[in-house]
Amino acid sequence: MAGGNTHRKKSCACCKEYLEHLGGKMRCFLRRMAADSMHSMIMPDRFVSHFGGKIPGTIKLESPNGILYVVEVTECMNKTLLQCGWEAFVDAHNIKEGESLLFRHIENSRYEVLILDSDDCEKVFSCAGIRNGSCVQDKTVDPVDSSGSSSNDTTQSSRSRNTENLTAMCSSSEKSGEDSPSGYEFHESVEPQTPSGSDYVLSRRTYLSEAQKERVVTHIQDIQPEITVFVAVMKKCNLQSPAPYLVISSRYASVHFPRETATITLQRPSKRKKWYPRFYKRIDKSDHMLRGQWQNFVHDNCLQEEDICLFVPTKGGRNFAFTVHLLQAEVTHSRDGTDVHKIGSSQNKRNSKMASQVHIKEAPGGDVSSESNKHGVSHESLESEDSDGPSEPPYISSMRRRLSQLQKKTVEEKVRAIQSEIPICVATISKLAGSGGKGKFRGLELSSRYAASYLPDKNHQTLVLQCKGMIWQINLVVRRRYTKGKRWFLTAGWRKFAHDNRLRVGDFCLFELKKKKKLTMEVHIISNLQRYPEVE
């Protein structure tokens, strides 16, 4: 009995200690990392309500090995966010999507953070590695070592400097929405009142005018989506033949689009008709794209430049489907300026002065998205009149001279007929690559820009070429240049291919990549256009 009483006393003591620990308030909350959480974190409403619905302007996050990180707390769309300084914390601890964070409130505005991996086991960190702080210092947010200090005054002054650095970083980020470290920008990177993860996502280097922001936010509030919306502003590369396409930010695609190349479904609000464009996932993990029936969607919905599309993922569906809301932009020539707004979707601020004057009128849906591309289109590829440049052209040519109007028209028609998911590689037959002649045979050189993205860089790979129902095995040779990178050539086996298909100087070969594991390409041949007159 005595032992039982002792056990009960210990249990009561533990309960009392736990209740005192709680202090009548909730102490902990758990968050699982998603793609949107890498740049800001939404705190649970129930947890915030236990603090009177208000969290101080800045809080301190203590990492598992005692280093403090100062993070700004903001309120957006009735949500409480950890924002400025949060990304530095994530980067310093290499926190990945699928991992979990357990926040425990210690005192005042200080929280202890336990980091769990995707298997729900605690992650172990090297104290020396994190205290070095190089990753964090690159982000201009200095860690504060609270594990031990010879002087309390030194620690306090260090924390003061930390807060000053945070304030400076936040102020500069609010003034400029450029150069977001995330690779693409959530809207609050440009306008802090719009939260990431709970509102919408813009592609990299995309800026909305005030009129666009207001219309987009209003429409999103009207439809109240439960999932983050992707916003795109239509440009020439999204609309014009031969192969219009829409670029999707890789981080957004990693959450809401298929993990590999696949067909998705698009539909309009309250409409029965559906479209099935092909979502192409690029090998290099940069921005991905919609092609194929995207052209049908553009045509059927009469999309024009400056129209805004909002892609709302369908919740809970097995297939990847999106409801697309449209905000139409109608060009006006009105001189009195009534209800005219400048809503340029320029990729940088110096282009904002050239923004078109347009009326915006609401369509039966709302849609926002804009893409930009860091990969410029050189003279090797199909030229675009869009100054922003497509992130990926319909085809890439290895020719140094520009195509004539007849050549360009013929190649574009062929590319459109092929309907490839990825760009076509276009090569022209030279004296050293044709089937005739006794000169030195060098083989056919492919576009290095195309090959660097879509072909292996290992030397002496076997490439299977298909043409008119027949198959040839070609040796793919990669030659390294000391100053200009690599060059790709089709050598052994190419002469037979050229002979069997009666290739002559000036003929065009369009290479369509069919398989990547067993490297296979379909070859479409266009005879020398100079033999035919330029007549319709």
Curated annotation (Swiss-Prot):
InterPro entries: B3_DNA-bd, DNA-bd_pseudobarrel_sf, REM16-like. The keyword Transmembrane helix does not apply. Pfam families: B3 (PF02362). PROSITE patterns: B3. Residues 138-199, 335-396 are annotated as: Disordered. Coiled coil: none annotated. Residues 344-355 have a biased composition (Polar residues). Residues 372-382 have a biased composition (Basic and acidic residues). Its main location: nucleus. Residues 145-160, 171-183 have a biased composition (Low complexity). CDD domains: B3_DNA. It is found in: Nucleus. One of its GO terms (molecular function) is DNA binding. Residues 26-119, 231-330, 429-529 bind DNA. This is B3 domain-containing protein Os03g0619800. It comes from Oryza sativa subsp. japonica. The lineage of its organism: Eukaryota, Viridiplantae, Streptophyta, Embryophyta, Tracheophyta.
